Amino acid sequence: MKNVLYALLAAAAVSAPVHAELALATAKNCMACHAVEKKLVGPSYKDVAGKYAGQKDAVDKLAAKLMKGGSGVWGAVPMPANPQVSEAEAKKLSAWILSIK
């Protein structure tokens, strides 16, 4: 019984940050155009993570895109700037997106 409790606590500790970042993405309206595993208006976060995989400065590059927007990378629909997202929030969201496998 004790081992089961430890396993549950460990799982909760790992999943808590995932839920926090998903909540932040929802609060900042990211989820209006993106989903974790499927393309909506914009690419899935899984696809974004794959595109930036292995790049040393991926968190900073993606954070800049989240704040300033961009166009031409994922098709004809541009991503608008997101002035409601602070630099710290953008980096937190970027790290979360890049962790998705």
Regions found by a protein language model. Give the residues of each.
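N-terminal export/targeting leaders of redox proteins
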Residues: 1-21, 101
